[in-house]
Curated annotation (Swiss-Prot):
Residues 1-24 form the signal peptide. This is Natriuretic peptides A. The modification Phosphoserine is found at S128. Disruption phenotype: Mice display increased arterial blood pressure which is dietary salt intake independent. During pregnancy, increased blood pressure is observed, leading to late gestational proteinuria and smaller litters. Impaired trophoblast invasion and smaller spiral arteries are also observed in 12.5 dpc embryos. In 18.5 dpc embryos, mice display fewer trophoblasts and smaller arteries in the decidua and myometrium than those in wild-type mice. PROSITE patterns: NATRIURETIC_PEPTIDE (PS00263). The precursor molecule is proteolytically cleaved by CORIN at Arg-122 to produce atrial natriuretic peptide. Undergoes further proteolytic cleavage by unknown proteases to give rise to long-acting natriuretic peptide, vessel dilator and kaliuretic peptide. Additional processing gives rise to the auriculin and atriopeptin peptides. In the kidneys, alternative processing by an unknown protease results in the peptide urodilatin. GO terms for cellular component: brush border; cell projection; cytoplasm; extracellular space; glycinergic synapse; mast cell granule; perikaryon; perinuclear region of cytoplasm. Keywords: Cell projection, Cleavage on pair of basic residues, Disulfide bond, Hormone, Phosphoprotein, Secreted, Signal, Vasoactive, Vasodilator. Residues 25-122, 92-102 form a propeptide.
Length: 152
C-alpha cells in the first residue's frame, strides 16, 4: 500500500507541476517583428519586379495559340456524342441476338478461372497450417501439415 501511495503522490505532483512548464509555444513567436517586416518588404519588392501575365503575353499571341490548338484538334477523328444509354452497343454476338458477355458465359468463365487459380501450385502452398518456409521443410521431411501435396 505504501508504494502505491508514493506512486500516486508522485503522479499528482507531476500533474500539478508540469502544466506550468509545458505549454503551447507558437512558431511565430520565435520570429521577431523586424524579421517579419523585412520579409514583407522583400515580398513587396519581388511583386513589383514580377511582370503581370497579361502584360507578358499580348491578346494577339493568345488568339494565335488557340488557333494552333484548334487546328491540331481538328485533325483528330470525331467522337460521336454520348446518347445517354448505359448499355454499350452489341458487337460480336449481335447476329445471334445476345451480347458477347452473356451472364451465363461470364459466370462459367469466372468459375473456370477461379478453379485454375485455386488448383495452381502457389495456392496449394498457401493452404497450410504453417508458413511457407516451414511447409517446405515439412515436405522434405514428411512431417509437415500438407506434405502429401509437395511430393514430386
Amino acid at each position: 500500500m505504501g508504494s502505491f501511495s508514493i506512486t500516486l503522490g508522485f503522479f499528482l505532483v507531476l500533474a500539478f507541476w508540469l502544466p506550468g512548464h509545458i505549454g503551447a509555444n507558437p512558431v511565430y513567436s520565435a520570429v521577431s517583428n523586424t524579421d517579419l517586416m523585412d520579409f514583407k518588404n522583400l515580398l513587396d519588392h519581388l511583386e513589383e519586379k514580377m511582370p503581370v501575365e497579361d502584360e507578358v503575353m499580348p491578346p494577339q499571341a493568345l488568339s494565335e495559340q488557340t488557333e494552333e490548338a484548334g487546328a491540331a484538334l481538328s485533325s483528330l477523328p470525331e467522337v460521336p456524342p454520348w446518347t445517354g444509354e448505359v448499355n454499350p452497343p452489341l458487337r460480336d454476338g449481335s447476329a445471334l441476338g445476345r451480347s458477347p458477355w452473356d451472364p451465363s458465359d461470364r459466370s462459367a468463365l469466372l468459375k473456370s478461372k477461379l478453379r485454375a487459380l485455386l488448383a495452381g501450385p502457389r495456392s496449394l502452398r498457401r493452404s497450410s497450417c504453417f508458413g511457407g518456409r516451414i511447409d517446405r521443410i515439412g515436405a522434405q521431411s514428411g512431417l509437415g501439415c500438407n506434405s502429401f501435396r509437395y511430393r514430386r
